[in-house]
Amino acid sequence: WLSVEPMQKDSGLFDKQLEDRMPDIQRFFSEAGHSGWHAKKHSGFCRFLTVKKSFRDDTLLVNLTTSGSEVKRFDKAGFTALMQNILGNRLAGLLHTVNDDPGDRPNTTDGTREILLGKPELIESICGLKFRISPESFFQTNPQSAERLYTKALDYVFEKDLGEKP
């Protein structure tokens, strides 16, 4: 928990467009002189970047969580422009949360949140149901797998006699 692996390129696990540009985001904060969060010392500015993806719309919701220590000199407009440049129309929402909780895993609902651009949530669809996804949402990251699981569960629910399944 004390170290962070800097993402330099697409890991194949999430979103190539965003992952390939992570060095640009890191450079933005480094050039501005913003410090990274030091979990052991409970100090620093940049805590984490939470990203949610709607596979239905191919859009992203980005929430930057920082401490309040350097917030007065944080260039919100510059960060917003950078994220728009990186994601274009795929950026559905950009949020900035200031959280000074010294804990290792601060609750993202604590602190103050500002919408820098767009909306504070995404919409995702699974089996025709629509879900509102916020930065705090625990949601299946692979909707296609979730649809298969839901469909299988519904098959079991609507079987007349579960005992006769081959």
Where are these regions (language model features)?
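Accessory RNA-recognition modules of RNA-modification enzymes
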Residues: 1-166
